[in-house]
UniProtKB/Swiss-Prot annotation:
Domain of life of the native organism: Bacteria
Reactions listed under catalytic activity: L-histidine = trans-urocanate + NH4(+)
One Pfam match: Lyase_aromatic
An annotated GO BP: L-histidine catabolic process to glutamate and formate
Descriptive protein name: Histidine ammonia-lyase
HAMAP family: His_ammonia_lyase
Predominant location: cytoplasm
């Protein structure tokens, strides 16, 4: 089990990937403890004073002007959680919920939500016991935070709802007992602090960012293999071309193609042929994939900032004793980042689909029609390409930005919302579709490279070819093809092909202790 020490405000992408996908145990930086205590004391003092403060002794949303008497403050927080637990749809995945828990813990531990350490310890207890609250995936509009899904997560602390433990579906009371916890009574503001925030949108976007990073690296490998399968030129990857444009992602993508294709015997065999220019799907790969890379890097930066943010409302400032209402719960940054990732994922798949079309077209590729030597009685990759085209078309619709939509809610008090949760959630389908398109391309490109025998591709890509053939044999006559596509797609999603790509992302680099973090902030800035 991997131990991850949470440093609120200074989490890294590598830590977030580890938390989501590894068997990890969370610890909290001790410097958080006095900060949390000061925030909780500030809220308790306001509650005792009777001074009106939103979320502490008032109603919520359009009911914010309603004063709540002291003897109903605990009931107010409980009712808030119960009334907001109205999510629908399939439950969020275990990696997503683990990340939601970690992000919520980190946000609360910065001391500006005014909750007690007891509440944070309960969330840590759930995580470390392997308890995964059952959180429906639909029902949030991304402002005021991810209310409905976070209410389902929070209800578990009250002994209400359901969870998963070791794959078993159990009631909340049993889940709490497994974690060594009893149902809690929430203090002033604690229910609101649990529900307010962008942690669900952010966790969804991060989990799918990590999937799209794997897809991107796989696409570089598949695209390079297709260059050799189509007997394409290496000249478009020359560093001098890309330096003149200066786009960072393009420069990095071109360098990756050069590394992947270095030493190709196929290229040497046709280096002096009369072909002048390849189709764009081969020649412009650095430009298209580089633009995707720049989008992904920007989205990752935005999401990392949000993962370290306090997106609660109102916010507690212990130094001045103030509680300030704002709008940090609005998910627009997450929605924009997710929409940018959607564009990148769709374009990765669109370019791969075009390369498949090129490979099966004998006129363009110089290979046998549909990549099978005895065409006619055999249809080869004809309909596998149709599947890729169908998925690429779906991706175009899924790439439509969710953030441009808004519906007013809460009697027009919440009159503009981000739709960040949907923007982040649909990335999963985009990543999955694109992984399947790439599986088909890898199979087609492997077929094309083998049809170039006796010439061989580069040493790096020969290893990729060996991986493909360890799962799926050469296609010489028609056979039941769906299991082959599924087998390679599983390897794509698991990162087996991405590991052959020399380019990597920040989330895949193991943090080098404190060197990977910004300077340690003082307690008040945690």
């Amino acid at each position: 089990m991997t131990a991850v020490c949470l440093h609120p405000g200074r989490l890294t992408l590598a830590e977030l990937r580890t938390i989501a996908f590894s068997d990890s145990r969370l610890e909290l930086e001790p410097a958080c403890f006095p900060v949390v205590a000061r925030g909780a004391a500030t809220v308790a003092a306001i509650a005792r004073s009777g001074e009106p403060a939103y979320g502490i002794n008032t109603g919520f949303g359009r009911l914010a002007q309603t004063h709540i008497p002291d003897d109903q403050l605990e009931l107010l927080q409980k009712n808030l959680v119960l009334s907001h637990a109205v999510g629908v749809g399939e439950p969020l995945s275990a990696p997503t919920v683990r990340l939601v828990l970690a992000l919520k813990i980190a946000s609360l531990a910065r001391g500006h939500s005014g909750v007690r350490m007891e509440l944070i310890n309960a969330l840590l207890g759930l995580f470390n016991a392997g308890v995964i609250p059952r959180v429906p995936s639909k029902g949030s509009v991304g402002a005021s935070g991810d209310l409905a899904p976070l209410a389902h997560l929070s209800a578990l602390l009250l002994g209400i709802g359901e969870a998963y433990v070791d794959g078993r579906h159990v009631p909340a009371t049993e889940a709490l007992a497994i974690a060594g916890l009893a149902p809690m009574t929430l203090a002033a503001k604690e229910g609101l602090a649990l529900l307010n925030g962008t942690q669900v949108s952010t966790a969804l976007a991060l989990v799918n960012l990590f999937a799209i990073e794997t897809v991107f690296r796989t696409a570089l490998v598949a695209g390079a293999l297709s260059v050799d399968a189509a007997a394409g030129s290496f000249k478009p990857f020359d560093a001098r071309i890309h330096a003149l444009r200066g786009q960072p992602g393009q420069i990095d993508a071109a360098a990756t193609y050069r590394q992947l294709l270095e030493g190709s015997g196929i290229n040497l065999a046709h280096r002096d042929c009369g072909k002048v220019q390849d189709p764009y799907s081969l020649r412009c790969q650095p430009q298209v994939m580089g633009a995707c890379l720049d989008q992904m890097r920007h989205a990752a930066r935005v999401l990392l900032i949000e993962a370290n943010a306090v997106s609660d409302n109102p916010l507690v400032f212990p130094d001045s004793g103030e509680v300030l209402s704002g709008g940090n719960f609005h998910g627009e940054p997450v929605a924009f980042a997710a929409d940018a990732l959607a564009l990148a994922a769709a374009e990765i798949g669109a370019l791969a689909e075009r390369r498949i079309a090129l490979l099966i077209d004998a006129t363009l590729s110089g290979l046998p029609p549909f990549l099978v030597t005895e065409g006619g009685v055999n249809s080869g990759f004809m309909i596998a390409h149709v599947t890729a085209a169908a998925l690429a078309s779906e991706n175009k619709l899924l790439a439509h930005p969710a953030s441009v939509d808004s519906l007013p809610t809460s009697a027009n008090q919440e009159d503009h919302v981000s739709m960040s949760t949907f923007a982040a959630r649909k990335l999963g389908e985009l990543a999955d579709n694109t992984a399947t398109i790439l599986a088909i391309e890898l199979l087609a490109a492997a077929q094309g490279v083998e049809l170039r025998a006796p010439h061989r591709t580069s040493p790096r890509l020969q290893a990729v070819l060996a991986l493909i053939r360890s799962r799926v044999p050469h296609y010489d006559i028609d056979r039941y093809f769906a299991p082959d596509i599924a087998s390679i797609k599983d390897e794509v999603s698991a990162g087996a092909f991405a590991r052959h790509c020399p380019l990597s992302f920040d989330s895949e680099r193991v943090a080098d202790g404190e060197a990977s973090r910004s300077a340690t902030p003082d307690d008040e800035s945690l």
